[in-house]
Amino acid sequence: MSYDGKFQVSTLAIHGGRVSDTHAEAVVFPIFQTATFEQQETGVTKGHSYSRVSNPTVDALEQAIGALEGTPQAVCFRTGMAAITTLFLATVKTGDHVIVSDVVYGGTVRLFREILNGLGVSNSSVDTSDVEAVERAVTPLTRIILIETPGNPTMKLTDIAAIAAIARRHNLLLAVDNTFLKIGRAHV
């Protein structure tokens, strides 16, 4: 089940992305607590090998989040910093520039200061509640705009639609860190 306008968020939260439990035919999808999964042969899995990589419970969660957000896919991480780090390591390279909201989590600031800057990725800390300031911060080397709204702990708001328009105009990725907003198409 995916969001197509017919279902309320509460229905999607219960049934969205529903995965059939072929293991025990449970009505509510079970939580798999195993660390490792049986393999057909060494290095050949039946779908999952190790829970730190993937497992049926996480698959079901990702499908449910995708349904709630109205997108065909979602990826769940163990922590917000794991998600942010993966985003940047997968999308930027030496010489690239990133615009970062001036109210992001301190761990994100340290990620740039202690790791990404050392890899040659520059960043500009910008008051993203000031749309014109974001536009001025874009350079030919900019690849991503990272915002957090409402900002934590300031509660400063950024106009997601306005920043998304800047990102589209310059062919940039837009990442929105979310501490306070609910899931379920909170951006609509």
Outline where the language-model segments fall.
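Generic N-terminal initiation segments characterized by hydrophobic and/or small/turn-forming residues
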Residues: 9-11, 58, 157, 169-170
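Conserved N-terminal alpha-helix of the aminotransferase class I/II PLP-enzyme fold
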Residues: 36-85, 107-114
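N-terminal "arm"/small-domain region of PLP-dependent enzymes with the aminotransferase-like
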Residues: 2-55, 61-64
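Residues at alpha-helix termini
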Residues: 24, 68-69, 119, 170
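Conserved PLP-enzyme active-site core in the AAT-like
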Residues: 2-3, 74-187
